[in-house]
């Protein structure tokens, strides 16, 4: 059994609030200064990890005490995660860096069921958390010989440009004659967990913008992927970072002022080059290019799993990885088949993931329209989900298993999240074991905690291919042995 480490950090609020300061996130108009003080309660003889599996932070926001629970995002990297860059003469250089003891976390606020958190603990505490419906950011002040951090709201960040930005996908607004249920009434069915094995590519313009600092680029992409993973976990989609590319010697596909041309060329490169040497489900290009017509991103619609079209492009923002993650989540949503939100769509926040106009305000929520479309349509589409069931082996997701993180790992029968959030009657959230009498908790061949009858169609054929059928003895949907 894994020995869970309890780490308590008290953040003492500095006796004044700052009026203005320049941080990594930009110029901050108003902020609180806090000092993380770390107290570790380790069993006698235990060896402390560099980055603990579980941490707890206690601090005050607006003079109100909060308790922030953090858990290392063990599903962030695949076991065969690789990074590729290129020598000045264009030679491909691929490495397999150790990523087991990484420093990226997800979390929640105690006694706030709607709270979320995405934090990097690599060099101080950096990231964001949602408390009582409002998003706060924490970031080191980077003062000499000081552990001071700033806590601030996004509304206090000076904006580069207030003009609205656009997604390049058009003619895809939400339309439905069916009434949309309230957010609390829309349930994501307890189907089989889906996995998107993702490669993120930094183009040469982005590489140059960061002065060729590979460490900084990879850290930004790790942080982006951690945020992206946190956004999609609520749909039971596990985004696994399987590879990172840096086009260090020059662009490997056309990157122009036209988002459409850039997307087409990147898709062709992915099919011709990347797929031939790296297995993955989807690739996203992060670019330093500023596209025409204030376009921030572009993706093919309903294209997940397609060799050429399962791609998206997103403009990089050096100081705001949370916004990059929101925009990448948006384009990835189009790949899955999501429409843009209409005027009547809502998510309980000022901005939703699939809003047509790209907001400067970060959001981690899909709207009621998106959730309805996902639960009634996308989740059942065999064309855009066929590659998402080939889950990485439980041993392919690095680090030991932890019950309650939504990912079924070695030694678990199921994992429906923390007991307070679990809505699966087949799974005991406290133990990650099946409830008494249950044969299964999710899967295409699991219905009301029981295996579906042998011969039940679980995946409809595409084109001239064959349907897949349940075998009556497992929850998964086995591949038809007579497939072409």
Curated annotation (Swiss-Prot):
Ca(2+) 2 binds at residues 402, 405, 409, 412, 415. It comes from the Eukaryota. Residues 21-191 form a propeptide. Residues 194-392 form the Peptidase M12B domain. GO terms for biological process: proteolysis. Residues 1-20 form the signal peptide. Residues 400-484 form the Disintegrin domain. The active site is at 331. Expressed by the venom gland. Disulfide bonds join 305-387, 345-369, 347-352, 403-422, 414-432, 416-427, 426-449, 440-446, 445-470, 458-477. Binds 1 zinc ion per subunit. The modification Pyrrolidone carboxylic acid is found at residue 192. Its EC number is 3.4.24.-. Zn(2+) binds at residues 330, 334, 340. Ca(2+) 1 binds at residues 197, 281, 387, 390. The N-terminus is blocked. Fibrinogenolytic activity is completely inhibited by EDTA, but not by PMSF. Negative results: does not show hemorrhagic activities after intradermal injection in mice. Does not show pro-coagulant and anti-coagulant activities. The disintegrin domain belongs to the long disintegrin subfamily. Monomer. Snake venom zinc metalloproteinase that inhibits ADP-induced human platelet aggregation (IC(50)=120 nM (native) and IC(50)=248 nM (recombinant)). May act by binding to the receptor GPIIb/GPIIIa (ITGA2B/ITGB3) on the platelet surface. Degrades the alpha-chain of fibrinogen completely and the beta-chain partially, leaving the gamma chain intact. Also inhibits the growth of several cell lines, including human liver cancer cells (Bel7402), human leukemia cells (K562) and human gastric carcinoma cells (BGC823). Belongs to the venom metalloproteinase (M12B) family. P-II subfamily. P-IIb sub-subfamily. This is Zinc metalloproteinase-disintegrin jerdonitin.
């Amino acid at each position: 059994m894994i020995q869970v480490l309890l780490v308590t950090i008290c953040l003492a609020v500095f006796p004044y609030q700052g009026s203005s300061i320049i941080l990594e996130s930009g110029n901050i108009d108003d902020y609180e200064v806090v000092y993380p003080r770390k107290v570790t309660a380790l069993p006698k003889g235990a060896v402390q990890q560099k980055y603990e599996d579980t941490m707890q932070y206690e601090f005050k926001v607006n003079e109100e005490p909060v308790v922030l629970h953090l858990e290392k995002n063990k599903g962030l990297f695949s076991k065969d995660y690789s990074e590729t860059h290129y020598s000045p003469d264009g030679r491909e250089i691929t490495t397999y860096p150790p990523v087991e003891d990484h420093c990226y976390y997800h979390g929640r606020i105690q006694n706030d069921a709607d709270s979320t958190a995405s934090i990097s603990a690599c060099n101080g505490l950096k990231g964001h958390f949602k408390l009582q419906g409002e998003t706060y950011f924490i970031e080191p002040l980077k003062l000499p010989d000081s552990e001071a951090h700033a806590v601030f709201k996004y509304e206090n960040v000076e904006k580069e440009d207030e003009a609205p930005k656009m997604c390049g996908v058009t003619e895809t607004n939400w339309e439905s004659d069916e009434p949309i249920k309230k957010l609390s009434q829309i349930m994501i069915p307890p189907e089989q967990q889906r996995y998107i094995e993702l490669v993120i590519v930094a183009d040469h313009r982005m590489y140059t913008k960061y002065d060729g600092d590979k460490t900084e680029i990879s850290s930004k992409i790790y942080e982006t992927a951690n945020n992206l993973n946190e956004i999609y976990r609520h749909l039971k989609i596990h985004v696994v970072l399987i590879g990172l590319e840096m086009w260090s010697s020059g662009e490997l596909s056309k990157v122009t002022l036209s988002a459409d041309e850039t997307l087409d060329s990147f898709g062709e490169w992915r099919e011709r080059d990347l797929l031939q040497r790296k297995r993955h489900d989807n690739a996203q290009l992060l670019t330093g290019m500023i596209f025409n017509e204030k376009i921030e991103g572009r993706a093919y619609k309903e294209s997940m799993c397609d060799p050429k079209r399962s791609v998206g492009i997103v403009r990089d923002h050096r100081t705001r990885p949370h916004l990059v993650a929101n925009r990448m989540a948006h384009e990835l949503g189009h790949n899955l088949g999501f429409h843009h939100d209409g005027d009547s769509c809502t998510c309980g926040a000022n901005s939703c993931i699939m809003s047509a106009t790209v907001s400067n305000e970060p959001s981690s929520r899909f709207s009621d329209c998106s959730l309805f479309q996902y639960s009634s349509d996308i989740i059942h589409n065999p064309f855009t989900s066929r590659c998402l069931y080939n889950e990485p082996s439980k041993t392919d997701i690095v680090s030991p298993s932890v019950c309650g993180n939504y990912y079924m790992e070695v030694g678990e029968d199921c994992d429906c999240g923390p007991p307070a959030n679990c809505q699966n009657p087949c799974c005991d959230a406290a133990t990650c074991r099946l409830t008494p009498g249950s044969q299964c908790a999710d899967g295409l061949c699991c219905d009301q905690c029981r295996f579906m009858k042998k011969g039940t169609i679980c995946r409809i054929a595409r084109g001239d291919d064959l349907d897949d059928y349940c075998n009556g003895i497992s929850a998964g949907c086995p591949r038809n042995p007579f497939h072409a």
